[in-house]
């Protein structure tokens, strides 16, 4: 699934929103090393982002690649202890169009637009932490490859999944979805979140005349 925004369009927008000098592109060798840790090729948009912008640009979100590696390695160790819940990035990502239609129905009914799974989702990799055990995961393959999903890593029996939408600025206690039901590809996800962060910073600097 491709983003509405292209990498060049994203660069143009980020040059207006953020400081592109803070972007440090990753060399190909480091991207390959990350893929070796993950055990699967990175989705095209995410891979291109790393090669062009590295971890990201300030004041937008910065990806913590060391955290991604550490969480991946720790999860592999956990799976050795609990093989019945093991799920790996190279396995098929299970979310289908029917699942997404279900999310839309739930949102229309003002219910939580979440998908229940009894274990971590195969076909995903760690992307970023939102604090505590709230984690955005990147779909690695399938028709929703490159989209970003949120879960609560409470290890591990009752896990729900939903499209990650951190730009909605909802507290973790509200499950960070705020009714959002549409899968969002990585470039769109990063751009929307950066817009929200920049807007919030701008509002915080405005004088209060009340």
Each language-model region and where it sits:
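A surface-exposed partner-binding patch
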Residues: 1-128
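Intrinsic-disorder-associated interaction segments
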Residues: 3, 7, 92-96, 176-191
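Helix N-cap / beta->alpha transition motif
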Residues: 59, 64-74, 162, 166, ...
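Segments surrounding the PLD/"HKD" phosphodiesterase catalytic module and close analogs
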Residues: 134-177
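Low-complexity, Gly/Ser/Thr/Pro-rich intrinsically disordered linker/tail segments
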Residues: 178-210
């Amino acid at each position: 699934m491709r983003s509405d925004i292209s990498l060049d369009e994203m660069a143009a927008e980020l040059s207006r929103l953020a400081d592109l000098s803070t972007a440090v592109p990753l060399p190909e060798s480091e991207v390959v090393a990350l893929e070796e840790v993950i055990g699967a090729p990175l989705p095209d948009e995410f891979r291109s982002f790393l090669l062009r912008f590295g971890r990201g640009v300030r004041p937008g979100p910065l990806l913590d690649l060391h955290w991604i590696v550490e969480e991946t390695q720790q999860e592999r160790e956990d799976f050795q202890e609990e093989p019945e819940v093991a799920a790996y990035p190279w396995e098929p990502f299970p979310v289908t169009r029917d699942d997404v239609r279900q999310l839309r129905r739930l949102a229309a009914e003002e219910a939580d637009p979440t998908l229940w799974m009894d274990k971590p989702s195969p076909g995903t990799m760690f992307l970023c932490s939102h604090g505590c055990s709230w984690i955005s995961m990147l779909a690695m393959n399938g028709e929703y490859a490159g989209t970003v999903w949120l879960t609560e890593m409470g290890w591990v029996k009752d896990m729900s999944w939903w499209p990650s939408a951190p730009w909605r600025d909802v507290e973790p206690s509200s499950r960070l979805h705020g009714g959002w039901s549409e899968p969002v590809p990585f470039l769109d996800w990063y751009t929307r979140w950066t817009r929200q962060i920049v807007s919030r910073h701008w509002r915080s600097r405005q004088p209060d005349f009340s």
